[in-house]
């Protein structure tokens, strides 16, 4: 059993070294083992010239569950689009494939991005990965894939009972719809539903409205709010 534990920790260190090889010289060490939202992880930290890196590598599958690279970001040199591209490339490298940026905002020199898994044009919001990018250097400074690892699965997608056109008729007439998408969204207690997403404006505010694709009932509505912490959905 002891040899098996050593093999697991060695593999976690190997994965850490490969992922963060471009972050500067450092000597990573396993600082413990923890349950992170039902995912057993090895905690690994390393002090580099650019700052400290802390990461959690899953015991099963060797996936990067989360990490923080404590690097200060100063002057903004990269656009939102460049940050999205760099984050997408990084996720691909980690094995998180078919991911689409569904939300982003900049704050304090850092671009905060949410990526969701997509399949046949359908956005799977439960399968979410959060990524932070330094807008000065393009370095990925943070990641949280907890939701993705807990929820990602092969889904049996049944054909919707209603069309997106029918769902549009259920949207408040005062909402000026700018975009529409098909998505799977969480509805509580581990349940999901297929919905049509409508993004629009009303009285200078942006709203996200979700209409159930099978019942045509409004299941969620969010308003975009600007706060000191950044742009949030509430």
Language model: regions and residue ranges:
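Long, terminal "pre-/pro-" and other extracytoplasmic accessory regions
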Residues: 1-234
């Amino acid at each position: 059993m002891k040899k098996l534990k050593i093999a697991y920790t060695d593999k976690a260190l190997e994965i850490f070294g490969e992922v963060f090889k471009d972050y500067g010289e450092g000597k990573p060490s396993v600082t413990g083992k923890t349950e992170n939202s039902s995912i057993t992880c090895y905690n690994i930290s390393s002090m580099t010239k650019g700052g400290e890196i802390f990461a959690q590598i899953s015991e099963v599958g060797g996936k990067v569950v989360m990490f923080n690279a404590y690097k200060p970001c100063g002057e903004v040199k990269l656009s939102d689009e460049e940050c999205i591209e760099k984050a997408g490339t990084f996720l691909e490298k980690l094995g998180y494939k078919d991911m689409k940026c569904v939300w982003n905002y900049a704050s304090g020199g850092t671009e905060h991005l949410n990526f969701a898994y997509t399949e046949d044009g359908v956005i799977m919001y439960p399968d979410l990965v959060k990524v932070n990018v330094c807008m000065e250097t393009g370095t990925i400074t943070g990641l949280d894939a907890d939701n993705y690892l807990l929820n990602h699965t092969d889904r049996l997608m049944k054909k919707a009972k209603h069309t997106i056109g029918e769902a549009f008729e259920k949207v408040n007439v005062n909402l000026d719809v700018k975009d529409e998408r098909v998505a799977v969204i969480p509805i509580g207690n581990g349940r999901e539903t297929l919905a049509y997403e409508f993004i629009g404006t009303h009285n200078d505010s942006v709203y996200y409205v979700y209409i159930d694709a099978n019942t045509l009932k409004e299941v969620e509505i969010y308003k975009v709010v600007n706060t000191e912490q950044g742009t949030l959905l509430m």
